[in-house]
Curated annotation (Swiss-Prot):
Annotated glycan sites: N62
Chief place of localization: host cell
The protein's name in its UniProt record: Protein MGF 110-11L
Keyword terms: Glycoprotein, Host membrane, Membrane, Transmembrane, Transmembrane helix
Protein family: Belongs to the asfivirus MGF 110 family.
Spans traversing the lipid bilayer: 3-23, 69-89, 94-114
Its membrane topology: Multi-pass membrane protein
A GO-annotated cellular component: membrane
Organism per entry: African swine fever virus (isolate Warthog/Namibia/Wart80/1980) (ASFV)
Function: Plays a role in virus cell tropism, and may be required for efficient virus replication in macrophages.
Presence of the UniProt keyword Cytoplasm in the record: no
Entry keyword Phosphoprotein: no
Domain of life: Viruses
């Protein structure tokens, strides 16, 4: 668990899905934490950006939902990893571990409609 958290904190690049629609191209906006003022944008159909004015355009009405889903899945990935680490530390049986994972999975499925509101 400590190794996983260390790798997560040590990873210096954040990729944010900026915009995705069937009618338009998809783009990833990359921010490097090691190099100050380093920004790059990678698109499915690359085009030249002369200024950083395009950075304002990636906020649309779905951005809050994207952040909610990202945080939700981040929290539940920690919960799944914690469940497996707990099972290993306590020497639980495989049946008990699977029951815990099933309960977490059911909780994830039941909380999906709440995220869409």
């Amino acid at each position: 668990m400590k190794v996983f958290l260390g790798l997560l904190l040590g990873y210096s690049t954040i990729l944010i899905l900026t915009y995705q629609s069937p009618a338009t191209q998809w783009c990833f906006y990359e921010i490097s934490l090691k190099i100050p003022n380093h920004h790059s944008m990678e698109c499915s159909y690359p085009r030249l950006y002369k200024h950083f004015m395009f950075m304002k355009k990636w906020r649309d009405k779905n951005w809050s939902i994207i952040i909610r889903y990202y945080c939700f899945y981040l929290v539940f990935s920690f919960a799944f990893a914690g469940c497996i680490a707990f099972a290993i530390c306590k020497n639980l049986r495989l049946c008990t571990t699977m029951k815990l994972l099933m309960l977490l999975s059911i909780l994830v499925l039941l909380s999906q409609p709440i995220l869409n509101n």
